[in-house]
């Protein structure tokens, strides 16, 4: 079963998938093993991820491992219709199209759950949220889940703290081979890529304000600086603010940054990072972009209330005319890298989705002894993925000698 925009788009989607596959060597190795061992035979996996080419490679990997796949998007604007069609053509149950309404978005999540999955793979926790609220009749069938992103992990840990979480979830986001690369290098490149594609403007010479200095914010600030921008960071955490300053960036409150910024990029995972009092202080022509999971980091309601007129001036660019100035919002305030571009680079998602595939296998093999809480990815898995990635890149590294290992384990040898 499938509900996509146009199944006839599948050939173009397949071309994108094949291109991504060529640049995802770690996941390819896992797929070959899954194809032979069929660990997911008889298992249904429900997925809510950004439905584009790299995600399709992950879904295909799980399918090769014997799984029945039911998949939808995790954001109304991130699905690529040709890729969704290609996934449907492969025999997956696909319910997704770009430009879904909020109602359609949740209907599609529910359609995935109608397949009664044994394992869920989520990005943002909306699928898991539904299971714990409106689809509780399915909980007994769930072995466990995997969560991809920072925003979802924040929600899951809040659920765990309240005792509301009913099954184990693997924290893929905090794997070293995920957040150190996906969040930093992936978001850093793809967020700027989305802004450049949407606006066709020069970054050099502009003041770019980055809200949040977690791994995503670090990456965005680094890439904006590399393109010639003056970068300002806003933070609520004094340690991260200090780190940003030591990294060479100006640090100030958003109310001050609002007065000098040309481009604003939110990377916090929190709501109302840019709101009315900030918008009122912004320059004419200020550009707002969000690189966080949900579309509430920039308060769109405040923009709408302040605007005398609203119109789309370019694909992915909405102009809010406040009378005395114009403010531009990219991608409707949703993930700029996916709403306005193709998301993270293939090589980065290779590691992230290798973690997802192996985390799903870990759930399958260990669910009976796992408690209903959030679990970290095993460190051995991180090391294996990093080693495979280095090998694919043609890089060799040193190994400790026996004497070095002994030295590191012996407390007696000192000065």
From Swiss-Prot:
Give compartment(s): Cytoplasm
Record InterPro entries:
Adenosylhomocyst_ase-like_sf (IPR042172), Adenosylhomocysteinase-like (IPR000043), Ado_hCys_hydrolase_NAD-bd (IPR015878), NAD(P)-bd_dom_sf (IPR036291), S-Ado-L-homoCys_hydrolase_CS (IPR020082)
The disulfide bridges present are none
Q: What is this protein called?
A: S-inosyl-L-homocysteine hydrolase
Q: Which CDD domains match?
A: SAHH (cd00401)
The cofactor note reads: Binds 1 NAD(+) per subunit.
Q: How does activity depend on pH?
A: Optimum pH is 7.0-7.5 and pH 9.6 for the reaction in the direction of SIH synthesis. Shows no activity at either pH 6.5 or pH 11.5 in the synthetic direction. The activity of SIHH in the hydrolysis direction shows essentially the same activity over the pH range 6.5-11.5.
From the UniProt record, which GO molecular function terms apply? Answer: adenosylhomocysteinase activity; trialkylsulfonium hydrolase activity
* Binding residues for substrate: 123, 148, 178, 182
Record's catalysed reaction(s): S-inosyl-L-homocysteine + H2O = L-homocysteine + inosine
Q: Which metal ions or organic cofactors does this protein require, according to UniProt?
A: NAD(+)
Quote the EC number: 3.13.1.9
- Share any extra remarks: SAH is a product of SAM methyltransferases and is known to be a feedback inhibitor of these enzymes. As a result of this inhibition, organisms have evolved efficient enzymes to metabolize SAH via different pathways. The pathway found in methanogens differs from the canonical pathway, it uses the deamination of S-adenosyl-L-homocysteine to form S-inosyl-L-homocysteine for the regeneration of SAM from S-adenosyl-L-homocysteine.
Temperature sensitivity of activity: Optimum temperature is about 70 degrees Celsius.
Keyword Cell inner membrane on this protein? no
Q: Which SMART domains match?
A: AdoHcyase, AdoHcyase_NAD
**Gene Ontology BP annotations:** one-carbon metabolic process; S-adenosylmethionine biosynthetic process; S-adenosylmethionine cycle
């Amino acid at each position: 079963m499938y509900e996509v925009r146009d199944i006839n788009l599948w050939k173009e989607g397949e071309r994108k998938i094949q291109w991504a596959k060529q640049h995802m060597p770690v996941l390819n190795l896992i797929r070959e093993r899954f194809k032979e061992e069929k660990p997911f035979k008889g298992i249904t996996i429900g997925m809510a991820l950004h439905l584009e080419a790299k995600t399709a490679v992950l879904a295909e990997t799980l399918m090769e491992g014997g799984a029945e796949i039911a998949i939808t998007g995790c954001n109304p604007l991130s699905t690529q219709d040709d890729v969704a069609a290609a996934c449907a053509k492969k025999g997956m149950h696909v319910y997704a199209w770009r430009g879904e309404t909020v109602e359609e978005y949740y209907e599609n999540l529910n359609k995935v759950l109608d397949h009664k999955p044994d394992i869920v793979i989520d990005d943002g926790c909306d699928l898991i949220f539904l299971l714990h609220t409106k689809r509780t009749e399915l909980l007994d069938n769930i072995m466990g889940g995997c969560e991809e992103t920072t925003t979802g992990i924040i929600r899951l840990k809040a659920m765990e703290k309240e005792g509301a979480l009913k099954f184990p979830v693997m924290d893929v986001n905090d794997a070293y081979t995920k957040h150190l690369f996906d969040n930093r290098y992936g978001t850093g490149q793809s967020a700027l890529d989305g802004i450049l594609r949407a606006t066709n403007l020069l970054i050099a010479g502009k003041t770019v304000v980055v809200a949040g200095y977690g791994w995503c914010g670090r990456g965005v600030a680094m890439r904006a600086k590399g393109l010639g921008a003056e970068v300002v960071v806003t933070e609520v955490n004094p340690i991260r603010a200090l780190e940003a300053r030591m990294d060479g960036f100006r640090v100030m409150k958003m109310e001050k940054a609002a007065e000098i910024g040309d481009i604003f990029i939110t990377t916090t995972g929190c709501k109302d990072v840019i709101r009315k009092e900030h918008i009122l202080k912004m320059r004419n022509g200020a550009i707002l972009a969000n690189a966080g999971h949900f579309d509430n980091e920039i308060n769109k309601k405040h923009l709408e209330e302040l605007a005398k007129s609203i119109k789309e001036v370019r694909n992915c660019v909405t102009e809010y005319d406040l009378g005395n100035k114009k403010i531009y919002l990219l991608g409707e305030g949703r993930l700029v890298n996916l709403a306005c571009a193709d998301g993270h680079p293939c090589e980065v998602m290779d590691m992230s989705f290798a973690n997802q595939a192996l985390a799903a296998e870990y759930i399958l093999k260990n669910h009976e002894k796992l408690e209903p809480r959030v679990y970290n990815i095993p460190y051995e898995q991180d090391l294996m993925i990093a080693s495979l990635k280095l090998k694919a890149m043609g890089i060799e590294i040193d190994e400790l000698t026996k004497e070095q290992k002994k030295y590191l384990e012996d407390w007696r040898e000192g000065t």
